[in-house]
Amino acid sequence: MSQSKYRQLDVRAPRGTTLTARSWLTEAPLRMLMNNLDPDVAENPHELVVYGGIGRAARNWECYDAIVKALKNLESDETLLVQSGKPVGVFKTHENSPRVLIANSNLVPHWATWEHFNELDAKGLAMYGQMTAGSWIYIGSQGIVQGTYETFVEAGRQHYQGSLKGRWVLTAGLGGMGGAQPLAATLAGACSLNIECQQSRIDFRLRTRYVDEQATSLDDALARIKKYTAEGRAISIALCGNAADIVPELVKRGVRPDMVTDQTSAHDPLHGYLPKGWSWEEYQQKAESDPQGTILAAKRSMADHVQAMLAFNEMGVPTFDYGNNIRQMAQEMGVSNAFDFPGFVPAYIRPLFCRGIGPFRWVALSGDPQDIYKTDAKVKEIIKDDKHLHHWLDMARERISFQGLPARICWVGLEWRQKLGLAFNEMVRSGEVSAPIVIGRDHLDSGSVASPNRETEAMRDGSDAVSDWPLLNALLNTASGATWVSLHHGGGVGMGFSQHSGMVIVCDGTDEAAARIARVLRNDPATGVMRHADAGYDIAIECAAEQGLNLPMVAATQGNAK
């Protein structure tokens, strides 16, 4: 069988209520797979790349065709197994089991390196699924906008008395994830300078309104920043160039941003971080002809980039890693103090994780934006008193362009996810929305990931690298009846540095769906509260008690403490 990773084909998910599969429970993963490869969604859809370096939706186009065929023919009591983007089996299960189970990029720990993975990938034996690329629940840059917004807002609270007006953020990377940064900074009230080495990515973010304007040079960018901050305007500026050149140059000039981070694809030095002095075309060619030399050149440039970030940190500028493992890469190149600045989770996000709060998202399978606007209103109706959340939803409607099927991201926790899911299911039942809705999340969530350089960095009990938790999360979501469940390795931070799981559940308006939703959307965020309570976080222990979670050892510990 040929193994083509390139096809000149534009894929778009069907819209409306006409099924192309045998039920909405199989139509949903089919549409979401296709949506991941929509040209308005994916970074490089003709090569099956959704985002994050080489994060793919299917191993090759032949596998894609086979997945589509399998989903169209899947019965209501069958489950499709997908192994690193390849459909490998269809088995009889039962109607409340997942319709699809996915495992992507998983390697035995000793062999969990980019070198070994790339060998397997070249042989057609593996696929890098990132987080939501290979699990078919990517919704474009919106998927990370609110998390980035919450991070910037919390940084503003901690460092600038709660306001980022008149301040600016320095960052880099305008790919599928990094592309959220300029809009998130704007929504948080800050200007931003966003460095990106590929003009095509800047064009994509300008077209989708994630970035406001592009500067012609560094001097032009700084002049714009000076003007807009003086006026108190929150404008995002893109600059085409290499962060490994520009960030050190800013240090050399004595420029002082108000916040510094980075979201280049540093997790993948072979495909995701342009070495200094190279063109993108040269980078791609050398990745094929001299992979080891290319990796070394990229990591050397990352070291220069991180040293400049460290210099800003030493100046007292709030500086943090945004989860791309750039500190690790720099440390491997001899930057011994690379971890002197923190990751964004321990610095700003962990208290949310302790309450099971994370990136809850949903998609209107109808393709009708009105269905999303109606669900926005339903969220406000149910969560009446959360002004911060209402403000987010208002800003999202005003500023966020839908990519592919209309979708919404909304950070909510254990207390609310089940209630929202049941309400959405009732909206489908009553005809208030025109077609079923799928609910999912990023793998970056409170109980679904082990990533010592990102989500589980600096855990209170030292359990940063314990990956039992995402495995338990995937098992519990399978037992609870999620429509599809995924278990991945290497997302966000690269091979050897993370394991993580995802779930998606369909609201089709039936009683059976309501029962599954009630289980999944309680149990899934509850694993995050459990994980953090087990690690000794008081916020999580209190949340577990408030929500009536049965955590035997936490209860025993609390009893002994009393």
From Swiss-Prot:
InterPro entries: Urocanase, Urocanase-like, Urocanase_C, Urocanase_central_sf, Urocanase_CS, Urocanase_N, Urocanase_Rossmann-like, Urocanase_sf
Pfam families attached to this UniProt entry: Urocanase, Urocanase_C, Urocanase_N
Localisation per UniProt entry: Cytoplasm
Principal location listed in the UniProt entry: cytoplasm
Pathway involvement of the protein, from the record: Amino-acid degradation; L-histidine degradation into L-glutamate; N-formimidoyl-L-glutamate from L-histidine: step 2/3
Active-site residues, record numbering mapped to chain: 410
Residues bound to NAD(+): 52-53, 130, 176-178, 196, 201, 242-243, 263-267, 273-274, 322, 492
One GO MF term attached to the UniProt entry: urocanate hydratase activity
Keywords associated with the record: Cytoplasm, Histidine metabolism, Lyase, NAD
Cofactor note text: Binds 1 NAD(+) per subunit.
Biological process according to GO: L-histidine catabolic process to glutamate and formamide; L-histidine catabolic process to glutamate and formate
Organism domain of life: Bacteria
Entry-linked PROSITE patterns: UROCANASE
Cofactor: NAD(+)
Major enzyme class: lyase
EC number of this enzyme: 4.2.1.49
HAMAP family on file: HutU
Function: Catalyzes the conversion of urocanate to 4-imidazolone-5-propionate.
Similarity annotation: Belongs to the urocanase family.
Protein name, entry field: Urocanate hydratase
Organism: Klebsiella pneumoniae (strain 342)
Organismal lineage: Bacteria, Pseudomonadati, Pseudomonadota, Gammaproteobacteria, Enterobacterales
Gene: hutU
